[in-house]
Regions:
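Membrane-interface transmembrane-helix boundary segments in multi-pass integral membrane proteins
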Residues: 6-21, 160, 178-218
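A glycine-rich, hydrophobic loop/mini-helix early in the fold
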Residues: 44-88
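Alpha-helical transmembrane segments in multipass membrane proteins, preferentially the mid-helix core
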Residues: 84, 137-153
Length: 245
């Protein structure tokens, strides 16, 4: 019988540490490969991402008798996994297929790993699936960033923000149609585990705080790579003002 999941308990911190080490090692080693081998490695990661996302609902629903209403691949992290998986497989790569997962994945998957929506720890299968799935999303993004040398662009930030906000509508409709415990993008309720959403107003008004917070997190995600986009004699503060204005 699995023990209850403890936020920042021993198993949680070990899973975070191992995930970080694996991603770091693979991205460092990737820089020592030639271009052809890098592309091959990228395709392997892309295939792994897509196969996992396609098979995961069936594993949960038919293998472990989980309710289908809550295990469809409709969360932001699922979208990130599919997009970055396709991006890594593309010969002519679509920049937005990298940039959307860059923000959604780094912001969303990282937050998910730090505050997992889990009830039980290892050896519960959901514990493994959760960390494996979110970990490889970050691996795909950082492999594209650190090995393939793709970058998010400033002019696409607001495009990403608009796409994110517009997607809230169909996701909300899906939640309402499915009913029950359907809670994709956590629009209907906060996660079961502890998270920053616990500090927000009670649902559904929690989204009034979550939406702007998400955009702030997305922008903070961009800051570390912003130095590659600074114009001559421009500071990071100038960059922030240019983005906001």
């Amino acid at each position: 019988m699995s023990e209850p999941f403890i936020l920042f308990g021993e198993q949680h911190t070990q899973a975070l540490t191992y995930s970080f080490i694996v991603i770091l090692i693979l991205c460092v080693l990737g820089n020592f490969l030639n271009n052809k081998t890098q592309e091959f490695a990228a395709k392997l990661i892309g295939i792994s991402l897509l196969v996992f996302e396609v098979t995961k609902p069936f594993i949960y629903i038919y293998g472990f008798d989980k309710p289908w209403e809550t295990y469809l691949p409709l969360h932001m992290c699922n979208f990130s996994a599919v997009l970055i998986g396709i991006f890594l497989l593309q010969k002519k790569k679509n920049q937005m297929f990298f940039e959307l997962p860059f923000y959604w994945g780094i912001g969303g998957a990282t937050m998910a790993l730090i505050t997992p929506d889990l009830d039980f720890a290892w050896p519960d299968i959901e514990f493994f699936m959760f960390f494996y799935g979110h970990g490889q999303i970050l691996l795909g993004i950082f492999f594209a960033l650190a090995v393939l040398k793709y970058r998010p662009y400033l002019q696409n930030f607001w495009k990403m923000a608009v796409i994110t906000i517009l997607l809230l509508i169909p996701v909300l409709v899906v939640n309402l149609i499915i009913g029950g415990e359907a809670n994709y993008w956590y629009l209907m309720d906060t996660p079961d585990g502890e998270s920053l959403m616990d500090l927000m107003p009670a649902p559904p008004f929690h989204m009034l705080g979550v939406a702007p917070l998400a955009l702030v997190v997305f922008f903070i995600t961009y800051i570390p790579v912003s130095y590659t986009h600074l114009r001559a004699h421009e500071t990071v503060l100038d960059l922030v003002c240019r983005l906001l204005l």
